[in-house]
A protein has these predicted regions:
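A surface/extracellular/periplasmic glyco- and lipid-processing/surface-interacting theme
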Residues: 1-151
Length: 151
């Protein structure tokens, strides 16, 4: 989308915390940068409990994206896998959150087949209009919804 203000009626959400495995090295933190209308990503915490900026390997700059999706999915063990790996069900439908323009939108998602695009819809059934630019998708097991916190 190119228009500003499309989602002004939705609640503000400047900070997003996704604490995988109960806070630690794998925690994802997104802070809304009003100046650039983007989200700065950090990963994990330092010894003083401050988020560690997640730097792009090539540019060495902190990762920033225009849209963040939290997609809740069903997680299950892969049968007979000797390493105990997990499967995340990405085909089908579910719920999630979209963070865009400093706002948060409760969404539903639908993906008809493995080679199809995942579609995201607001509570009225309208397709989400994402900002031009990067989209970061955080796939979160639906049993861990309480570990996704925003304000």
């Amino acid at each position: 989308k190119d228009e500003v203000g499309v989602y002004d009626s939705y609640p503000n959400a400047n900070d997003l915390f996704i604490d995988f495995w109960f806070k630690g090295d794998y925690s994802a933190i997104f802070k809304y940068d009003t100046e650039n209308n983007s989200y700065l990503r950090s990963m994990g915490y330092d010894e003083n409990d401050n988020p560690i900026p997640h730097a792009d390997q090539d540019t060495k700059e902190q990762i920033n994206v225009k849209n963040v999706i939290v997609q809740y999915v069903t997680e299950s063990p892969i049968p007979n896998d000797p390493k105990g790996r997990l499967d995340y069900e990405l085909v089908g439908s579910g719920t999630g959150l979209v963070f865009i323009d400093g706002k948060v939108i409760d969404v539903t998602w639908n993906k008809e087949a493995r080679d199809e695009r995942t579609m995201f819809y607001d509570s009225d059934g309208a397709e989400i209009q994402f900002n031009r630019g990067q989209i970061w998708v955080s796939v979160v097991p639906d049993r861990n919804i309480e570990q996704v916190v925003y304000n």
